[in-house]
């Protein structure tokens, strides 16, 4: 479906590019636009917006995000600036929970390999 296809594209961008600096806001129209939600995550929910390419339905339990990191911002990234972007996001990046942050590339590799 659309969500899974977009995630595969985003995952390719994610692994092919060097890690970039986090952005503090969502800027649509640059790079690839992520779908608003994935399977199992209601649109506009403020629960656990995992901001990394997710090659599977969103987490079954929304609060069980692997390895939240407090020094990174919860945001959508665009490939024009960083070479990759999120596979999915909420309607607005400011709806993200303040305690939920981006995960590191190393965590993603450990999870998905």
Curated annotation (Swiss-Prot):
This is Chorionicgonadotropic hormone-like receptor. It comes from Stenotrophomonas maltophilia (Pseudomonas maltophilia).
